[in-house]
Amino acid sequence: MPITNTDESLSAASAPLKPGAFLHEIFSDRARQFPERTAVSDAARTLSYAQLDALSTKLAARLRDEGVTYGTRVGMYLPRSVDLVTSLLGILKAGGTYVPVDPQYPGKRVEHIVRDSELSLIIGDAANLPKISSLRVLALDELLSAPALQPAAQDTRIDPNNSTAYIIYTSGSTGEPKGVQVSHGNVSRLLESTQRAYGFNAQDVWSMFHSIGFDFSVWEIWGALAHGGQVAVVPYDISRSPAALRQWLADQRITVLSQTPSAFRGLDEADRGNTAPLALRYVVLGGEALPASVLRPWVERHGDQKPALINMYGITEATVHTTFKRVLAQDLETAAMVSLGKPLDGWRLHLLDANQAPVAAGTTGELYIEGAGVAQGYLNREALNVERFVELPGAVRAYRTGDLMTLESNGEYRYAGRCDEQLKISGFRIEPGEIEASLQTSPSVAAAHVGVHDYGDGDLRLVAYVVPGQGVDAWTEQARSEVAALMAENLPGYMRPSVYVPLAELPVTHHGKIDKQQLPSPAAGTALSGAADVKGLSEQEHFVLKVWSEDLGLKNIGVNDDFFDSGGTSLALIRSLSKLKTHYKINLDPGILADGATAKVLADHITRSLVQAH
């Protein structure tokens, strides 16, 4: 397998990376090289490189007709699909910058992205978009049905390193998400650097599993297209079902799979009962700290050679990935957490103290990232740019991550926490200040603090400690429901608190900071829509509620209460299904809750399965 030996530094004495290149030109080169190979597929259709090249070129011409020129920002309000890949290529070929807007985002977040990025054009479905007077919505099929025109040639004087390819919005500490501007050169050099480490080829089939609003998708799309490989779009329903995903990976002959450790836990569970042969060459893990326990069962079944297991650390502001660690079986026996490995070629890491001086060897310091991946900066956030995109001695531009690291004697980096309040859940970096600001827009909340609680096995959930505006006694079920509804309007699902804990006041230290040691257990909170009534329940309903309440901490959840609205998470659901499968000795999959994530729906399915089994 053409993969870098982990005993060798990826960055020391390596040849310099090439100058940055335009992503659409890299794609067009592959289209000329592999015209008949499959470029992208979803559940409905497949396009070859020649077909995708022709369609995206036609779209670029039509976008030029609509006024798109160099630097124009164009939104994409599309689900993962062939159309999405066609659209982003067309935008880039027209000279524009694509701004992904996940259709799963609540309306107010969509409105903020449109306003902050000053979008005037967006490709998507007008029926599902919030009505914004300044925004023209372009339907892809209508654009492509018009006569094709020859787009203007790319201005060769433009430097790919200064040309923004996309803007992805991440959580912001001031209460509003912030847009990260990433150049063509940032991404093209990421692709070159990771190619040195991996050795991708035109036979690779990459799964596109992640939301276009999460920068893992940049890697999944361009990693395939840059090397003549195939982007295989994971259908949404399959992406929510580990068992269905495991079968899909086998059916589609996927060779490159990217997962957060949280998602991989579910896939590993599903893999234990599925012997369909896999074509996987690489499983790339990132977005969260990686406990060794997540990989041990997989390695016991599959070994550590094929697929190769890779742990990568990265951040949106440094273009997806920064480090590389080939994980071997012995790594899982020597430490509880897998190391982050060494920097990619073209990236350089600095561990500095509060005065931006290097820390002593083996000492924890704040990570600053230098090199090819450092993004252009935040859109419309000049003060934050000065704070985070800094100049180190020697006129070196670097990104100040806020992540604490230690450098081990073998040259590998280990994560040691945060030096600020930022949280990380399911691969998403979350600024609790944004959630707290949203909470305090409610008249029911006078003050708030948001933290995270581990319910076991990596099941991390957001906890909101709230000071009710009219006192603790006024924190009724109705008040909680109204606040939760407000959060659903303002925040994406991964940023909504699972539990609300009412307090008379927030405990503070002598220095006026939140005293986290004095915050009560989330068990004191209200995650639920009402007290459970266990009268008249079937044995299956009673046992499901028992698992959800006692094992997952969803106290008093009712038989008809929605699991996710009651504070449950995808990982918690997988944990509960695993216990129920063991107890009843039947197969259970998250997909059975597609029509309602309630204990009644799940218990009814269990009852039917038990009847069929006998």
Swiss-Prot record:
Domain named Carrier: which ranges?
Answer: 535-610
Q: Which InterPro entries does this chain map to?
A: AA_adenyl_dom, ACP-like_sf, AMP-bd_C, AMP-bd_C_sf, AMP-binding_CS, AMP-dep_synth/lig_dom, ANL_N_sf, PP-bd_ACP
Q: What are the disulfide bonds?
A: none
* Keywords on record: Ligase, Phosphopantetheine, Phosphoprotein
Its recorded reaction(s) are: holo-[peptidyl-carrier protein] + L-threonine + ATP = L-threonyl-[peptidyl-carrier protein] + AMP + diphosphate
| Top enzyme class | ligase
Keyword Kinase among record annotations: no
MF (Gene Ontology) = ligase activity; phosphopantetheine binding
The UniProt family comment states: Belongs to the ATP-dependent AMP-binding enzyme family.
Instruction: Give a short account of what the protein does.
Output: Involved in the biosynthesis of syringomycin E, a cyclic lipodepsinonapeptide toxin with phytotoxic activity. Specifically adenylates L-threonine and loads it onto its peptidyl carrier domain, via a thioester linkage to the phosphopanthetheine moiety. Is highly specific for L-threonine.
Q: What is this protein called?
A: Syringomycin synthase SyrB1
What species is this protein from? Pseudomonas syringae pv. syringae
At the highest ranks, the source species' classification is: Bacteria, Pseudomonadati, Pseudomonadota, Gammaproteobacteria, Pseudomonadales
What's the name of its gene? syrB1
